[in-house]
Amino acid sequence: MRVLKYFRAPSSLRHRSSPMAQFLRRFSSSPMANEDEFQSPVEPSQQQSQDCVSESYLIGFVIANIVGLKYYSGRINGREMVGLVREPLNVYDNNAIRVLNTRSEQVGHIERTVAAVLAPMIDSHTIVVEGIVPNTRSNSNRYRIPCQIHVFAKLEASSTVKSTISRGGLVLISESDTSFGLSEAVVVKEQMGNGDKRSVDKIFKLVDENVKLMGKLVAAEPPREVIKSELFAHQKEGLGWLLHREKSGELPPFWEEKDGEFLNTLTNYRSDKRPDPLRGGVFADDMGLGKTLTLLSLIAFDRYGNASTSTPTEEPLDGEGDKIEKKGKKRGRGKSSESVTRKKLKTDDVVGMNVSQKTTLIVCPPSVISAWITQLEEHTVPGILKVYMYHGGERTDDVNELMKYDIVLTTYGTLAVEESWEDSPVKKMEWLRIILDEAHTIKNANAQQSRVVCKLKASRRWAVTGTPIQNGSFDLYSLMAFLRFEPFSIKSYWQSLIQRPLGQGNKKGLSRLQVLMATISLRRTKEKSLIGLPPKTVETCYVELSPEERQLYDHMEGEAKGVVQNLINNGSLMRNYSTVLSIILRLRQLCDDMSLCPPELRSFTTSTSVEDVTDKPELLQKLVAALQDGEDFDCPICISPPTNIIITRCAHIFCRACILQTLQRSKPLCPLCRGSLTQSDLYNAPPPPPDSSNTDGEDAKSSTKSSKVSALLSLLMASRQENPNTKSVVFSQFRKMLLLLETPLKAAGFTILRLDGAMTVKKRTQVIGEFGNPELTGPVVLLASLKASGTGINLTAASRVYLFDPWWNPAVEEQAMDRIHRIGQKQEVKMIRMIARNSIEERVLELQQKKKNLANEAFKRRQKKDEREVNVEDVVALMSL
C-alpha cells in the first residue's frame, strides 16, 4: 500500500450541526434466553451462544428420560445424536426442552425435573447441552427412553455448574468417574487440538479440489428465447452447476444407503425413507463476477426446455429490457401490461417440480433492487419474463396474483414486517425457487428477517453472497437453516458437529464443513483470473488537521478519555452505553468536519449510574439529533438496520418490533443494561429527515472547508487534470457529510450526484442509472453513503474511489469497492482511503487490520475476549488509553 503526502487545511473554521448514531450493537453482552431459533421472540443471544460453544469444555453428563414419545412421530435409534432445543414459551412448562431427531422431527421432551435444573443455565448461556441416546430403544417402554445429556461449560464456570446440578438433585457423571469412559460420552467428547490457524478460504479448499478432480465444470448455454447477452465462460460453468444442483437426485452429504436403510454417518440416524435431495445451495462467487446474470439464466430454464451443454452461441440479440410491474393501483392487484406467450415446461425438464409452480422469489436489500431491474433490462429479451415488485404500501395481498409472474422481487425489510401477518401472500405461496441475494444479511439467525425467510415454502433454495463468512463459521449456520439442510439446520447439531470442533482446533470440524460446502456451494474468486479485470490499487492519504481543528479535537479527546476511563474503572461502561457510542461517534465526525459536531453536542456526561432520558430531556434530544443524520447503525437485538425506531428511557435504541417482543416476557428487562422496562419507558424516534436530493446542500454548508474537504478537492482536481472525463465515487458513513461536500465540489466545477439511505428505491435507481449513463460526461462525482451503496449495485462507470472516513469492519469497505471493481470495469481503479493523522481514525485502521487477521484465522481456538465485536478492550485501543 502506497502512502500519499500529507495535506494541511486552512486554519479558519466554524461549526454547524448534527451527528449520526453509530456503534449500536457493539457492546451487547447481557445474557439472554437461548430460545427456539424461528418461533420465539428475538434476543441478542447468537453471539453469546456462539462464544459459549467455542470456549466450552465437556464437564460430564446426566442421565435423563425423553418423555411424551407417544405424542410425537419422530423416530430414534440407538447411539444416535439428538437435538435439544429450549422451548420457553411452552404453555405447560416454561423450562421445557424439546428433543429432535436428525430430520427435525420431534421425539419428545426431556423430563420436567431435569429440565428445571438445566434450562436456567441454558438461558443464561452458562452451559450448552447435547444429547445422545445410548442404546437401541427397547419395546418394553413406549413412553420414555433414556438419554445422556452432555453438559459443556467454560472452565471458569465449571465449579458453579457442578454445584448447581448437584443441588438440583441430579447426578453429574464427570471424566473422573469410572463409568464415564464406559459411556456413550466418549462418542461426543471432543479431543482438544492446538488451535491451528486456518483461513476462511480453507472451508472452500475442498470445493476447488473437487473441481480439479472433475475437470472443468460442465458449462450450459442459457435459453436464447430469454437471455440475449453472451455469458462469460465461468458464468456458463456456474449455470451448469446451478442446474445440476436443482436436478440432482443424489443423497445429501453424510448420508449413505446401507442394508436397505439410509444412514446418517454423523448422527447414526437410520430410516427406511430416502432423504430428500438438496435442490439448491450456496452460490458464493466473489463480488463482481456476474452472479445476477447467471441466476437470470437459471430462471430462464423454467420457461424454455432442457439445459444444453456448451456450444457456440449466436450473437446477442438487440432489444429493450422487460417491463417491471411495480404494484397495483390499489391494494390487492398488480396489473401487467405485457401479454406473454409461454412454452409449456415438460415435467421431466425439472426433477420433482410441481407443474403449478413457476414463480421465483428474489429477496434482497433495497439498494440491490435497482441492480436486478437493470440486469433484466440489459440481458433479457423484452416481454418474456413477467416481474412483480413486492414492495411498498400498495403491494398485492393476493396469492393468485403473485402466481402470474415469473419473478417476484422483494426486500428483507418487507418480509420482516410481514412476519406476524397471517395473511401474508408471500408466506402462503409455494414458490418454485427462493433466491436470497446478499444472503449474509441473515447471518444472525435470531433476527426477524432471518426467521421469516427460513419459514418460506419453496422447492429450491439458493443463498447468494460474495461474502458468505464475515465474522466466522457461525455465519454459515443461518444459511443451513434457510436451506433446510438437516441436521445442520438445527442449532444444537451445528454446535456439536461443526462449531465446537472448529473452535477447539479439532480437525473433524473443518473436514466436515469442507465436505458440506464442497457439496452444496460454488465459489470462484477474482484472483483466479476468470475475467480480465483491470488492476486495482489502494492508497492511504494522511491528512493533517488545521490548528483550530487540532485544538478542538485534542480537547474533546482528552475529555473523552477521562470519561471512558472513569466508566471502565467503575465497571459502568455498559450502563452508559449511549455515552460511549456518542464519544466515539463525535471524535470520528470531528476528523471529517467540525460542523458535524456543533457546540451543543460537545459535552460528555460522567455519571456512572444508568442513564435515564426521562430525567434528562437533553439526552433524549441528543439521541434524536444523532439518529437524524445517520443510517449506519443496527438494532442490537436483531443486528439489522432498525425499523420504526424506539428509544428507551435508559437511552438505548431498538426496532419497535424487537423491543415489543421483549416486553412480552413476564419480567421484561432492557436487553443491554438489564434495567426494568415497561411500555411507558419507550419513546418513538421521529421519522428520518425527508429526502433532500433536490437541494444543493446549502442548509448543511460549513463556512470554511475542513482539512479533509480541502484534501479531497486537491485529489479530485489532480484526477481531473489527468482525465477531464473521470467519474469518481466518494463514500462516507455520514449523510450530513455528503450534504456538506456538495457546495464546495460544485463550486470547483464538478457535476454532483448523491446516493444515500434516505432516498426511495425509485430515486436510488434513477441516480445509479444517471451516473452510469455514458452521455453524462465531464468530471462527475457521486457522493454515496457507504452502507446504502455497499451491496448489489453497479458503479463501474467510476474509476476513482475515495473513502472519506474509515469503518472498522473491512468487509463493508471491500463490498463498496467491489461496486466499482467488477465485471464491466474497463479502466484501472484507484481507491484512496483518507485518514486524519494522530486521531481515532488511525486506531480504526488498526482495528480493521485486527478484523482482517481474524477473518484469516477464523477457525483458531477462541480467546476469552470476544474478538469479533468491538468490546471493552477495543474501546481502550480506540481511545488510546
UniProtKB/Swiss-Prot annotation:
**Any Pfam family hit:** Helicase_C
Has UniProt tagged this entry with the keyword Glycosyltransferase? Answer: no
Extract the PROSITE patterns matched here.
HELICASE_ATP_BIND_1, HELICASE_CTER, ZF_RING_1, ZF_RING_2
The record lists the membrane-crossing segments as none
Q: Which SMART domains match?
A: DEXDc (SM00487), HELICc (SM00490), HIRAN (SM00910), RING (SM00184)
Region of interest called Disordered, as start-end residue ranges on this chain: 308-343, 681-703
* Broad class of the protein's primary localization: nucleus
The residue ranges of the Helicase C-terminal domain are 711-876
Q: Name one GO cellular component term.
A: nucleus
EC number(s) for this protein? 3.6.4.-
What GO molecular function annotation could you give as one example from this UniProt entry? ATP binding
Q: What class of enzyme is it?
A: hydrolase
Q: Where are the zinc fingers (RING-type)?
A: 635-674
Q: Which UniProt keywords apply?
A: Activator, ATP-binding, Chromatin regulator, Helicase, Hydrolase, Metal-binding, Nucleotide-binding, Nucleus, Transcription, Zinc, Zinc-finger
Q: Which family does it belong to?
A: Belongs to the SNF2/RAD54 helicase family. RAD16 subfamily.
Q: What is this protein called?
A: Putative SWI/SNF-related matrix-associated actin-dependent regulator of chromatin subfamily A member 3-like 1
Source organism per UniProt? Arabidopsis thaliana (Mouse-ear cress)
